[in-house]
Amino acid sequence: MDSHNSAPPQIAEVRMDISSSTSVAAGNKVCRGAACDFSDSSNSSKDARERMASMRKLIIAVILCIIFMAVEVVGGIKANSLAILTDAAHLLSDVAAFAISLFSLWAAGWEATPQQSYGFFRIEILGALVSIQLIWLLAGILVYEAIVRLINESGEVQGSLMFAVSAFGLFVNIIMAVLLGHDHGHGHGHGHGHGHSHDHDHGGSDHDHHHHEDQEHGHVHHHEDGHGNSITVNLHHHPGTGHHHHDAEEPLLKSDAGCDSTQSGAKDAKKARRNINVHSAYLHVLGDSIQSIGVMIGGAIIWYKPEWKIIDLICTLIFSVIVLFTTIKMLRNILEVLMESTPREIDATSLENGLRDMDGVVAVHELHIWAITVGKVLLACHVTITQDADADQMLDKVIGYIKSEYNISHVTIQIERE
């Protein structure tokens, strides 16, 4: 609980059970409206707004793709241009990929279940993976068709129509790139620190699990919001075991005002983040734009010299390879999430050293940092403190450091005595 916050705890329900045979006391306090970003995603207004904004962009992109695809199919047939037809096929894969992304965003809002305690956020990762595989499959088909046409001479190509259709395609792709790329991937530092949802974190719901061990050897679960309001408390006392364990799970419920002003500075340092499905769609559009430019250049050359129709096939080969390379980074990010690697924007060594440099901290071990999906990072570790250190104060310092410096939304800390 913050020292500057004098607001009394607000407790909606208290249950206490005492067993004389086991000398164990258990109590539960549940805060009104407490919701976990991972366990109950449908109650997270921040994630809901993120999904809705992303879905609107993808729906507009699908409509534009369908319109332009129809234009390219007609224009490609009339111009006898494989490059235009393959671009139309690429747009078809875009439509399918966007549809997968839309489904992924919708499914990510499903309420968590006992089996899926973190919700369905990772469906977004799987949807983006399928989307990328569609690009690779189509690129392989296009390369094969281009090679066949190189071996077997194709008919005449109308360079003027090829140029006009690809120019129109470039215009449509620019519109979609602006739409999908302007996803507020930059961090904002609002002084009030309340949660915004433009695909960048502003301190929405944070979750902490705290574990203390001291000489009394009890077991405590404590939930507390950002204003000092108790969320959940379970107290178990085990005499004779010589072990005190404090476990706290703490969603920090931010209101629209009155949040800790010291957190606003940390918001300025947050890494850029955008929804992975919107970013995947952006890569699709980027590949289409590059291909449209190539087709425009090829069309202009063929328009000027019709006998150089082989350029149509060369464009198909070159830009199919470029499209493949545009997906490498996204695929790497997807695999890192699925492999539960430490996110690249977080320096685990620096974080660990920062904890060890704190007064009262003896050692840090069992440090694990991973992500459920892009932008939703989790951390768990054991922190050993000196005998004379106050466990609660040390816990607050550790949690505050991790949140302010690294913006990790779900933290589990176990405090141990040396």
Swiss-Prot record:
One of its GO terms (biological process) is zinc ion transmembrane transport. Residues 196-227 have a biased composition (Basic and acidic residues). Keywords: Ion transport, Membrane, Transmembrane, Transmembrane helix, Transport, Vacuole, Zinc, Zinc transport. InterPro entries: Cation_efflux, Cation_efflux_CTD_sf, Cation_efflux_TMD_sf, CDF/SLC30A. Gene3D superfamilies: Cation efflux protein transmembrane domain. It holds the Pfam family Cation_efflux. GO terms for molecular function: zinc ion transmembrane transporter activity. GO terms for cellular component: plant-type vacuole; plasma membrane; vacuolar membrane; vacuole. The chain crosses the membrane at residues 57-77, 90-110, 123-143, 161-181, 283-303, 308-328. Residues 1-56, 111-122, 182-282, 329-418 are cytoplasmic. Residues 182-246 are annotated as: Required for zinc-binding. It is a multi-pass membrane protein. It is found in: Vacuole membrane. Its main location: membrane. Residues 186-248 are annotated as: Disordered. Residues 78-89, 144-160, 304-307 are vacuolar. Residues 235-245 have a biased composition (Basic residues). Belongs to the cation diffusion facilitator (CDF) transporter (TC 2.A.4) family. SLC30A subfamily. Involved in sequestration of excess zinc in the cytoplasm into vacuoles to maintain zinc homeostasis. NCBIfam families: CDF (TIGR01297). This is Metal tolerance protein 1. It comes from Oryza sativa subsp. japonica (Rice). The gene is MTP1.
